Design a protein with these regions (language model features):
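The start of beta-strands in P-loop NTPase/AAA+ ATPase cores
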Residues: 320-321
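C-terminal lobe/lid and adjacent interdomain/linker elements of RecA-like ASCE P-loop ATPase modules
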Residues: 22, 28, 32-44, 337-406
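Conserved D-loop-proximal element of ABC-family nucleotide-binding domains
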Residues: 329-333
Length: 406
């Protein structure tokens, strides 16, 4: 294996080898790797009345096509990797935040402090925000839906597994599969009223002994592994971790300085000589003309973004679903391509949003993995045209020529 976080060398070439087509052999290797084990997957997501989305908007990751290239982007018949495009103000950030609402009540991981500010659709803040998730856990299909008011308080909740109802709470009523969860009538009555707004999933997880492969345990594990982050005016993240790290202190403490140096060289072509840290030092220093200069004092905004990405890539071994908002805001367009090749080979679902149409190429993904979000809809490119799309098509040129209509 290569030295780029366990990723084969053909996925982490020098930066000048941009858009080098993945050979048939490499594609087969990636496909076999993707088939090596089942993953817990987010298969569908829908939301209504969230911020700017007055109508229901749905992302269906089971609607993939039968392209015979870049097979690694599909796992267990679910889209594993994708990029979301859309005009400014179309709702890319808000949609990604909506996907991560589930972290707020099913996980003790890091939360976005202002998440529930401007939570509901501005046209009618009294409307309930409705969320629908479909997960795939080793052949099981778990559908989980709920509604929250403008304070973020849950007002309804329901779950089905393989089409069979598990529980439902709505309008002061509560039903549950008592064979699967034998709980007293008095408790069922209290859950119907639920004055203290305890999510039913959390109650069952805390009250009922479950097997380690039970779908509720799998759901909890999946949500604990969800990660959203961005690096714009401020660095923000949701999920996966319970505390904030100092990036360079983390690199030093975990003896990753040389690995970080190779990462910067491989993805961006930048070569730094890092000084050996002295006892107690928590920041990186570079050696320039035999002088120690603080790393942060000499690097660009884009390289700072790469440092943040490097940190999260170290943590992605624990991740299940990752969304990086405006991931390439400070990247050169070719650097963004190299970063995507690394991200999309991770053993978890990874999605990004971007305005960089250089990434809209069949050398990286497929037309069913590039999405356009606009006017309260999100669709893959294959559903935005009647034309049959093939590997040889220049989909970036087609996009710029307005060939795709949402």
């Amino acid at each position: 294996m290569g030295r780029c976080f366990g990723i084969g060398p053909f996925l982490c070439p020098p930066a000048q080898n941009i858009r080098k087509k993945i050979t048939a052999t490499q594609n087969i290797l990636l496909y076999l790797q993707s088939k090596s084990k089942h993953m817990a997957m987010l298969a569908k997501f829908a939301v209504k009345n969230f911020r700017g989305f007055a109508e229901k908007i749905e992302l269906d990751l089971t609607r993939h096509s039968n392209f015979n290239f870049n097979l690694y982007a599909i796992k267990d018949d679910v889209i594993k990797n994708g990029i979301v495009y859309g005009p400014n103000g179309s709702g890319k950030t808000n949609f990604s935040l909506a996907v991560f609402d589930i972290v707020n009540h099913l996980s003790q991981k890091w939360k976005k402090a202002d998440y529930y500010a401007n939570f509901t659709y501005a046209g009618d803040p009294n409307l309930k925000v409705e969320f629908e998730y479909t997960f795939r856990f080793d052949g099981q299909t778990v559908e989980y839906s709920y509604a929250k008011d403008y304070h973020g308080i849950m007002t309804a909740e329901a779950m089905t597994v393989d089409g069979k109802p598990v529980f439902k709470r709505a309008d002061g009523k509560f039903t549950i599969d008592t064979e699967a969860f034998p709980i007293d009538k008095s408790i069922q009555h209290n859950l119907a009223d639920n004055a203290n707004n305890i999510p039913i999933v959390n109650f069952l997880l805390m009250s009922i002994p479950l097997a380690k492969d039970h779908y509720l345990i799998r759901l909890q594990q999946f949500v604990n592994g969800m990660l959203w982050f961005r690096n714009l005016d401020v660095r923000e993240f949701i999920g996966l971790e319970t505390s904030v790290y100092m990036l360079e202190e983390y690199i030093i403490k975990n003896k990753l300085i040389d690995d970080f140096r190779r990462f910067l060289l491989n993805v961006s072509g930048q070569e730094f000589e890092f000084a050996q840290p002295r006892a107690g030092e928590k920041v990186l220093f570079c050696v320039i003309d035999k002088k120690r200069i603080p790393f942060m004092a000499i690097i660009s905004t884009g390289t700072k973004a790469l440092e943040l990405l490097y940190f999260w890539m170290q943590r992605m071994g624990q991740a299940t679903f990752v969304f990086i908002d405006e991931f390439d805001a400070f990247y050169h367009f070719k650097l963004a391509f190299e970063v995507c090749k690394i991200l999309f080979n991770k053993d978890c679902q990874v999605f990004t949003s971007s305005h960089n149409t250089y990434l809209m190429t069949n050398d990286l993904l497929r037309p069913d993995c590039n999405f356009i979000l606009n006017e309260n809809k999100i669709k893959p490119l294959v559903d935005c045209t009647e034309k049959e799309l093939r590997f040889g098509h220049n989909i970036e040129k087609m996009f710029r020529g307005n060939a795709f209509k949402v």
